[in-house]
């Protein structure tokens, strides 16, 4: 019988953060952790085919295994291009 592990699943919005703790069987995947967290039912803006995922800021795939104490992070898509924002800030600084 597999041992149980505890995992956190996090999803952050500008106005609200979600942090769900789940208990899973050892050998569970990132996808199983997200499903067990219930976040897919709470947030219809999460699309596992589009949202990037990580464990403590390191990119992972849905089929990767989670370990006891991991924090699975569901990332939102970027709103603006980081290069463009840096360029705009540089232009603004140069204009001063």
From Swiss-Prot:
Protein's organism: Klebsiella pneumoniae (strain 342)
Protein family according to the UniProt entry: Belongs to the UPF0125 (RnfH) family.
Coiled coil residues, start to end: none
Protein name in the entry: Protein RnfH
PANTHER family in UniProt: UPF0125 PROTEIN RATB
């Amino acid at each position: 019988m597999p041992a149980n592990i505890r995992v956190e699943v996090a999803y952050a919005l500008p106005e609200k953060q979600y942090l769900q703790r789940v208990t899973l069987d050892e050998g569970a995947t990132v996808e199983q952790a997200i499903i067990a967290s219930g976040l897919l039912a709470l947030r219809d803006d999460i699309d596992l085919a589009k949202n990037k995922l990580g464990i403590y800021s390191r990119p992972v795939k849905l089929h990767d295994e989670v370990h006891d104490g991991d924090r699975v992070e569901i990332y939102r898509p970027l709103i603006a291009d980081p290069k463009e924002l840096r360029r705009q800030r540089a232009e603004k600084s140069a204009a001063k």
